[in-house]
Each structure stands twice: as structure tokens, then as C-alpha cells.
């Protein structure tokens, strides 16, 4: 008995009456031309999502660097002002929270909120932590590391966010 193996491209019926991916799990991402034309979207594999890379880039990508003498977090928060951001250290974690109320943009009204939590290395001097926001929207949280025999000072405290007028020197990933 011969069994025909079909490529995923041919598993979806073609036609204007077949439901497209308009109501799938990517509901909040917005619509693209291939979402509105079911014939075009079904000629591409149904498991292929063209906008995933764009979504990752727009989601506030962060970079953590921990070298021998310094710990640094770079976080893209270009849609937030320093007043919208709260940075605090609690025990061995830094928590960064951003929230802004409804604002008008090119497509209507939008509100945003995020919460990030990072574990601090045990040898970071928590009394010398700093946080700044560059003109291009890059939040930089940094702290020096201490020698392993010294106390790093673990307690809860808020870190003020200062604004810089120059763009960030963090490399884009």
C-alpha cells in the first residue's frame, strides 16, 4: 500500500471561505497583508509566522552582562519616561517595572506595562547601584562587584532613574 506524504503547505484548503489566522494566538500583534488574504497565507506553511522576529525586537529586549568587576543590565524601554519606571532592589533581585496610562499613537490609543526581575550576583555592592535612561530609551542598571570576602549589603531599596541626554552606548543585538 502506498501512502502519499504531503508537505505542510498542502494541508490547508485554499479558498476565501477557509478561516485565516486572524483569530489565532497572535491576536495582539496587529494585522499584516498575508493575514487578510487567506490564499497567500495558506500557500506559506501554516506553522510559519512571519512577524515573530519583529515581535521579539519590539518587546523590550534586555541584555545582561556580568564580568569580573561589574554587573550591567541594558533594557530597551523607549516607550516609557523616567516617571513611568520603578526600579528597586529586594534581597538578591532587581525588579524593573514600567507602566504608562493610555496614550494616543499613530494607530489609536495604547497603554503599556511590563515587569522584569533579574537575580543579582551575590558579590554586587548593592549600596553603589545606579540606573539611568538614555535619550534613545535604553535603561542601564549597573553596579560594581566587591571582593568575595566583603559584605555586599543586601537590603530592600529603591533605585532612582536618572535621564541622560545622549544615546546609549549599549550595542544593539
Swiss-Prot record:
Gene Ontology biological process terms from the UniProt entry: lens development in camera-type eye; negative regulation of apoptotic process; protein refolding; response to heat
PROSITE patterns linked to this entry: SHSP
GO terms under cellular component: cytoplasm; nucleus
Chain positions with Deamidated glutamine modification: 6, 50, 90, 147
Modified residues (Phosphoserine): 45, 122
Gene3D superfamilies (alphabetical): 2.60.40.790
Residues binding Zn(2+) 3, per UniProt: 154
Chief site of localization: cytoplasm
Residue positions binding Zn(2+) 2: 107
InterPro entries named in the record: A-crystallin/Hsp20_dom, Alpha-crystallin/HSP_16, Alpha-crystallin/sHSP_animal, Alpha-crystallin_N, HSP20-like_chaperone
Glycan attachment residues as annotated in the record: 162
Residue(s) carrying N-acetylmethionine: 1
Boundaries of every sHSP domain copy: 52-162
Keyword Mitochondrion assigned: no
Keywords (A to Z) from UniProt: Acetylation, Chaperone, Cytoplasm, Eye lens protein, Glycoprotein, Metal-binding, Methylation, Nucleus, Phosphoprotein, Zinc
N6-acetyllysine modifications at: 70, 99
Modified residues (Deamidated asparagine): 101, 123
Stretches with biased composition (Basic and acidic residues): 153-167
Binding site for Zn(2+) 1: 100, 102
Membership in a protein family: Belongs to the small heat shock protein (HSP20) family.
Cited function: Contributes to the transparency and refractive index of the lens. Acts as a chaperone, preventing aggregation of various proteins under a wide range of stress conditions. Required for the correct formation of lens intermediate filaments as part of a complex composed of BFSP1, BFSP2 and CRYAA.
Entry protein name: Alpha-crystallin A chain
Organism: Eulemur fulvus fulvus
Lineage: Eukaryota, Metazoa, Chordata, Craniata, Vertebrata
Encoding gene (name): CRYAA
Amino acid at each position: 500500500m502506498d501512502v502519499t506524504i504531503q508537505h505542510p503547505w498542502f494541508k490547508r484548503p485554499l479558498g476565501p471561505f477557509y478561516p485565516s489566522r486572524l483569530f489565532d494566538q497572535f491576536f495582539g500583534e496587529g494585522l499584516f497583508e498575508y493575514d487578510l488574504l487567506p490564499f497567500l497565507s495558506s500557500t506559506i506553511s501554516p506553522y510559519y509566522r512571519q512577524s515573530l522576529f519583529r515581535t521579539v525586537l519590539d518587546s523590550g529586549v534586555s541584555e545582561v552582562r556580568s564580568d569580573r568587576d561589574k554587573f550591567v543590565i541594558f533594557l530597551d524601554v523607549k516607550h516609557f519616561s523616567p516617571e513611568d519606571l520603578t526600579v528597586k532592589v529586594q534581597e538578591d533581585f532587581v525588579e524593573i517595572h514600567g507602566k504608562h496610562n493610555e496614550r494616543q499613537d499613530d494607530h489609536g490609543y495604547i497603554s503599556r506595562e511590563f515587569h522584569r526581575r533579574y537575580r543579582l550576583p551575590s558579590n554586587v555592592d548593592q549600596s553603589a547601584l545606579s540606573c539611568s535612561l538614555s535619550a534613545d530609551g535604553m535603561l542601564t542598571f549597573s553596579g560594581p562587584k566587591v571582593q568575595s570576602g566583603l559584605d555586599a549589603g543586601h537590603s530592600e531599596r529603591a533605585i532612582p532613574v536618572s535621564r541622560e541626554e545622549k544615546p546609549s552606548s549599549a550595542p544593539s543585538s
